């Protein structure tokens, strides 16, 4: 029976939140796009609506329709998963959930203190820096313009939103209620207060608060899923432009990873990987994988992305066209390489990259298994009758030596 529906706006976010339940042995399924809630056999269903880059009205409609379906199918709790850096259509999607659910209020706990993302006096911080002054404030696709959470919400909706003081209850309030949390203990305390009189019909937040849902919903039996043995060879496929990920790749390269940057043509020429030049490039990549146990293939140019921007401008490709074109090309490359005997464990970073790669091999569903690090998810899917594993990571997660540590751990496991 479906006990919890989680609605995410991108693929990596769907996984890093769903794994908070799956890691406790709770049957959890992650799907992209449409979902038949009446036919779902999992206890937890996470739906990636792919609305992060959509206009606000379209994003709201997708969330509203899914929420109405959940209400009609008697789902006990709906959790709107938001980005822990507040990217995307935050206000529009929260308002849509509240409206379609018919709930009196929507508790919103945006913090993820476990990785240094806190909400204090209504302001959202990334490791002590207001989010709009952090790297997320200059994100080329979804820059976060405001750190005060209620103001950010009101950029897209007129639904009332207010920040609650520590210890203040939601019982007599309406609208979107923003909770502070500087520590994981703050999130846990807020959760216990919210669940005092039963399960709230709607909640919102990121993976930070979702980590407490197994206990709060009474779904956890105390078990912990163990990490399966993985192929010690590691290929990192990076489509993220986040500075955190760029530093991680620099560190990995210095530690001996072989690093390949795709050219502007490889990223943006339609059908490139099916061309003679593309097939030759694929053969060279296979040789690289055969000769090197730790590899990176990335979509960033050396020293910035001006070369790709110039290439796109000369062909009339706008910023969104670049985003879609690059992730699509990476997906085509991935599909062509997927059957290679030299392909070991995969780590995909960036939600668009993950989606296109999974599309290329016909995988619409992923099953989160466990977290290797906070926000770093091991998931599995079925391909041609075989179970395949993939590691997923949002661009903004992890320490600088993350890739090196993961590679070492996989090799020793």
Where in the sequence are the language-model features?
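N-terminal short beta-loop-beta anion/metal-coordinating cradle
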Residues: 23-44, 289, 368-387
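C-terminal structural cap/anchor segments
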Residues: 288, 292-349
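Short acidic, glycine/serine/threonine-rich loops at helix termini
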Residues: 17-19, 89-93, 117-124, 188-193, ...
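A structural-propensity feature for long, helix-poor, extended segments
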Residues: 43-50, 293, 380-413
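Cap/lid and interdomain-hinge subdomains that line or gate substrate/regulatory clefts
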Residues: 1-4, 27-31, 43, 59, ...
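Short beta-strand segments
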Residues: 7, 46-48, 80-81, 107-112, ...
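Conserved, well-structured core segments that form the ligand-binding/active-site neighborhood
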Residues: 127-284
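Conserved, well-ordered active-site substructure
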Residues: 343-402
């Amino acid at each position: 029976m479906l006990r919890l529906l989680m609605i995410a706006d991108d693929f990596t976010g769907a996984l890093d939140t769903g794994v908070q339940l799956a890691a406790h042995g709770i049957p959890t399924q992650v799907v992209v796009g449409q979902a038949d809630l009446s036919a779902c056999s999992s206890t937890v269903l996470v739906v990636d609506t792919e609305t992060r880059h959509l206009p606000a009205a379209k994003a709201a409609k997708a969330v509203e329709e899914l929420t109405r379906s959940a209400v009609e199918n008697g789902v006990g709790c709906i959790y709107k998963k938001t980005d822990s850096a507040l990217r995307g259509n935050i206000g529009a999607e929260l308002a849509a959930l509240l409206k379609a659910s018919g709930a009196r209020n929507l508790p919103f706990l945006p913090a993820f203190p476990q990785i240094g993302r806190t909400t204090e006096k209504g302001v959202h911080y990334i490791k002590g820096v207001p989010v709009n002054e952090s790297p997320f404030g200059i994100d080329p696709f979804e820059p976060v313009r405001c750190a005060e959470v209620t103001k950010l919400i009101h950029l897209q909706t007129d639904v009332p939103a207010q920040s609650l003081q520590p210890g203040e209850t939601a019982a007599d309030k309406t609208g979107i209620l923003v909770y502070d949390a500087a520590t994981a203990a703050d999130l846990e305390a807020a959760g216990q207060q919210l669940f005092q009189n039963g399960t709230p019909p709607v909640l919102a937040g990121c993976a930070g608060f979702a980590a407490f849902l197994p206990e709060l919903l009474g779904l956890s039996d105390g078990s912990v899923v163990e990490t399966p043995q993985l192929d010690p060879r590691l290929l990192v496929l990076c489509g993220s432009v986040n500075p955190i990920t760029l530093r991680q790749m620099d560190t990995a390269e210095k530690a001996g990873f072989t690093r390949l940057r795709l050219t502007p043509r490889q990223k943006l020429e339609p059908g490139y990987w099916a061309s003679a030049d593309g097939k030759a490039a694929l053969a060279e990549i296979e040789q690289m994988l055969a000769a090197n146990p730790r590899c990176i293939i990335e979509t960033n140019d050396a020293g910035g992305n001006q070369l790709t921007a110039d290439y796109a401008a000369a062909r009339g490709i706008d910023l969104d066209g670049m985003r879609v074109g690059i992730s699509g090309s990476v997906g085509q490359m991935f599909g062509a390489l997927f059957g290679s005997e030299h392909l070991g464990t995969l780590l995909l970073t960036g939600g668009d990259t993950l989606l296109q790669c999974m599309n290329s091999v016909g995988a619409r569903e992923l099953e989160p298994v466990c977290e290797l690090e906070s926000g770093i998810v091991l998931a599995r899917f079925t391909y041609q009758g075989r179970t395949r594993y993939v590691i997923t990571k949002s661009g903004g997660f992890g320490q600088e030596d993350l890739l090196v540590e993961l590679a070492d751990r996989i090799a020793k496991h």
